[in-house]
């Protein structure tokens, strides 16, 4: 299997939250595609945050794309100069006021690798505590919700988690918990 070769690139739309690029590419068999579009986004993060008593820190907010209100994981954009972990910690503190805990990377996923160029880093923050107030962006209106494990699992089973980049790490969390699997990077003695 060979990669495509990019012959030309041109930005056709460039805004703070969305950039569209048109590439002229050569496929491995020599065919040319003059118009292949890539959506460029910054790196994203999301956080499965649990309090010391085992409740999950979730955010409830309106999502204009689907014109509805959803309960989701805390998530956001990694700012320039930040690592994904730093961005995830900042987003959790800004959106919820929760901080601290033991952090581990759960997975790195792509929303659609055929037409987007970014990755989402999904973290587990275990043992977070309320230490401050929310510091929301101008377009954010977020309610913090604390859910039990069974309430969160029920949301997944009822298909209430519409954001695939949030559902995937949650399904993985529950799968690993239920099959006594290791978290990536854990030693054999650090099983859940």
How should these model regions be labeled?
Residues 8-46, 52:
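Acidic, metal-coordinating catalytic segment for phosphate/diphosphate chemistry
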Residues 6, 20-22, 33-35, 59, ...:
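Hydrophobic residues on conserved beta-strands that form the core of alpha/beta folds
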Residues 42-72:
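A glycine-rich, hydrophobic loop/mini-helix early in the fold
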Residues 14, 65, 113-115:
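Short glycine/serine/proline-enriched coil/turn segments at secondary-structure junctions
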Residues 34, 44-46, 51, 77-165:
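Unchanged
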Residues 153-192:
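Long hydrophobic alpha-helical segments typical of transmembrane helices together
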């Amino acid at each position: 299997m060979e990669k495509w070769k990019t012959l030309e690139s041109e930005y056709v739309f460039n805004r703070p939250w969305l950039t569209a690029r048109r590439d002229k590419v050569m496929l491995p068999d020599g065919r040319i595609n003059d118009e292949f579009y890539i959506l460029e986004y910054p790196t994203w993060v999301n956080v499965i945050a649990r309090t010391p008593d085992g409740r999950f820190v979730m955010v409830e907010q309106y999502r204009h794309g689907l014109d509805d209100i959803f309960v989701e994981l805390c998530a956001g954009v990694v700012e320039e100069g930040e690592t994904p972990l730093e961005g995830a910690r900042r987003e959790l503190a800004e959106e919820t006021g929760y901080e601290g805990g033991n952090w581990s990377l759960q997975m790195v996923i792509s929303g659609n690798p055929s037409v987007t160029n970014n990755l989402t880093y999904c973290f587990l923050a275990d043992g977070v505590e309320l230490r401050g107030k929310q510091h929301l962006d101008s377009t954010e209106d977020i309610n913090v919700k604390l859910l039990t494990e069974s309430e969160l699992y029920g949301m997944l089973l009822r298909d209430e988690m519409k954001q695939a980049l949030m559902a995937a790490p949650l399904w993985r969390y529950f799968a690993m918990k239920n099959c006594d699997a290791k978290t990536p990077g854990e030693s054999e003695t650090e099983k859940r």
